[in-house]
A protein has these predicted regions:
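Glycine- and acidic
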Residues: 23-30, 100, 141-144, 177-180
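Active-site-proximal glycine-rich helix-loop-beta segment
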Residues: 52, 169, 275
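A gly/proline- and charged-residue-enriched helix-loop-helix capping module
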Residues: 88-107
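Active-site loop segments of alpha/beta catalytic cores
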Residues: 112-115, 119-129, 134-270
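N-terminal basic, low-complexity leaders that serve as flexible interaction/assembly modules and, when applicable
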Residues: 1-76, 112-127, 147-153, 192-203
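Short coil/turn segments at secondary-structure boundaries
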Residues: 32-35, 83, 101-108
Length: 280
């Protein structure tokens, strides 16, 4: 039998953050914000347990954005002077921070929510992190001058946090990589390698979630161009099957990925998410 779990993020209540916005703002600040994040996390843990899920997540209630929630705790990134950049192969424009110096973690990134979740559930705990390829597609490079080099730098930082999360008692660490459904050649060439750097040394279960993005017009129009069969994974799946990543989560409800392509993932335990994930 397959264990049951959410893909990752869950809606934030209106008393925590703005609703139905791509880049929502927090509705409070300071100690009140920290308490609101904790309250929302605990409410969703209870909801998941009440639903009978086998694996529990924090619902990403303490993060404004699935990428920025990590990179905000990285030195060498300028969030003040954001620039407009096309992301996901120029599918749409976004205001993104700039990498301007060597990348280093300021300290722990997700200790608060991981330890909170671990203390409030006896079930298996999953925690999500953005994948290195998706991070470099969501920030502007003004320092490294090489996308792969910057991805590997982020992968090292992700690895530091992933090992710390494992020490916090996390059972499954999932890396979110929507870039894997956009840059097929690059994902097979170096994206999976960067992912393995991020997962290096982990003894807990490792997973990658390949999501199709927010339900915004730009994403919906892009999906319409993919035809009646989405075979773009023929390049990426074999690379993932050969990797050390143990699980693949793929959003299938609104996709047209032929089921026979799952054979290309032999060696991985495949999960198919029932609905689009809240990531771009």
């Amino acid at each position: 039998m397959f264990t049951t779990a959410i893909a990752g993020s869950l809606p934030k209540p209106a008393w925590l953050a703005e609703t139905e916005k791509l880049w929502p703002q927090w509705t409070t600040q300071g100690p009140e914000l920290q308490q609101a994040k904790a309250d929302a996390t605990l409410l969703w843990i209870k909801a998941q347990e009440d639903a009978g899920l086998d694996v529990i997540g924090d619902g990403e209630q303490a993060r404004q954005h699935f990428v920025h929630g990590f990179v905000e705790q990285v030195e060498g990134i300028d969030f003040v002077n954001k620039v407009t950049m096309g992301i996901r192969n120029n599918r749409y424009d976004a205001q993104v921070p700039q990498v301007i110096a060597p990348l280093r973690l300021k300290g722990r990134v997700h200790a608060f929510e991981a330890q909170l979740a671990r203390a409030h559930t006896k079930k298996k705990l999953k925690f999500t992190l953005p994948g290195p390829m998706t991070i470099v597609d969501t920030v502007a490079d003004r320092f490294y001058g090489d996308k792969v080099k910057m991805a590997m730098a982020f992968a090292e930082l992700l690895n530091q946090e992933a090992l710390a999360l494992q020490a916090d008692g996390v059972d499954i660490i999932q890396f979110d990589e929507p870039a894997f459904n956009v840059y097929m050649d690059e994902a097979a060439d170096w994206g999976v390698k960067a992912l393995e750097v991020a997962a290096r040394g982990l003894t807990c279960i490792t997973a990658v979630h390949i999501c199709y993005g927010y339900g915004i017009e730009a994403n919906n129009k892009w999906k319409e161009t993919l035809g009646h069969e989405w075979r773009q994974y023929e390049k990426v799946f074999p690379a993932l099957a050969k990797s050390s990543i143990q699980q693949v989560s793929l959003e299938c409800m609104h996709s047209h990925v032929p089921m026979e392509m799952m054979k290309l993932l032999e060696g991985c335990l495949l999960y198919t998410s029932p609905s689009p994930r809240d990531c771009s």
